[in-house]
Amino acid sequence: MPVIGTFCVSVDKDVCVNAQSPGKCATCVEVCPYGVYEIDAQGQVHVNNYNTCVGCRICAEFCPANAIRINPAESEYLSRYPWTFGQIEEIHHKSLTGGYLLRGFGTAGPLPHFDGIVVVPSQLASESPRDKYREECQMEVVIGEDTAEEPITLRYPILFPAMSYGALSREAKLALAIGAAKTGIATNTGEGGVVPEEPYYANGYADPERKEQKWAPGGYLVIQWSTGRWGVSADYVNAGDAVEIKIGQGAKPGMGGHLLGAKVTEEIAAVRGIPVGSDALSPCRYYDVLSFEDMKKMVAFLRDVTDYKKPILMKLGPSRPYDDVRMAAEAGVDAISIDGICGGTGASPDVVTQGVGIPTIACIPPAVRALKDLGLHRKVKLIALGGIRNGLDAFKALAM
């Protein structure tokens, strides 16, 4: 696929009508107003001049075999901004369906991220650096040591965030549980209920009787308590090692969860307690929490249901980090997760994922400051989520 001008023109010869039967179709030649295509003496169509293509996609729209692809040879932000193909296609979709675009994953596009931050190394004027080959580094993190009878001790300062059963398959959920067990960290049910094997898999056992540990050193399962209350019961809340109250998430702050009906199989419907094939929509807030005092009562209620044995966490979306973290800490939780705009999701309106929230790196400093102002930064743990891709990103988040 030659690239000469601003746009790349490619024709799939396997489906092109003209390529299969020369002379039978020349729609692209007829509709292109810029002379990009030509037809030779044998009736075969060729791309004649890449330089004249302006990216209008008229040829692609009229091609009866859908064989033509027009893609920018450079970023659309340089060639067509602000009227990118994505913007135009979204307008078409809304006009045809009356609905918004719904998609998974997270925010796409250039946002402030960890790549824009560098680490200042230790040298003479600061604490001496450590020799990574010869000196040990304490990495354990304990959550709930002052409030829960059974605090959790993460072997490393990382964990698997909440991803619901339904957004992920059963196999994926159990793989995360085994991964948590092998590394001594925690995984999270998400708001879709618990897979039956998930609690003992996360603890490192292959059987519910927990006779012999298979995956050492064993990890933890965090049970998520969300606005939808999918599959919630006293047994559910006590099935794991900690409970997380979900207030929001990075990819769709201000909105509740959404599991598409196409993903609601018989097994998932049974766990969530909903009909097969129906969309699972969580409210955007807790209807039984109308004030800060109600939030404190919810934390106290969950401590009571778990017999004061398990740590209580709270997950926040990217809104007002300082004030939100301060309120969460004052509500009495043991750890606070704050999920930046780069966080992922199984399904969300594209307009919300792209345009609502603040970057993860902008959430961390005010969240830390809120805990310090309350004198709780050594007691309440802060968990940063959203777009952390590797060890360097995690290190930068810890350093902030």
PLM regions and their residue ranges:
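Iron-sulfur cluster-binding cysteine motifs and their immediate structural context
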Residues: 23-46, 58-76
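N-terminal cysteine/histidine-rich coordination modules
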Residues: 2-15, 34-36, 42-45
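Hydrophobic, small-residue-rich alpha-helical packing segments that form membrane-like cores
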Residues: 231, 239, 244, 249-285, ...
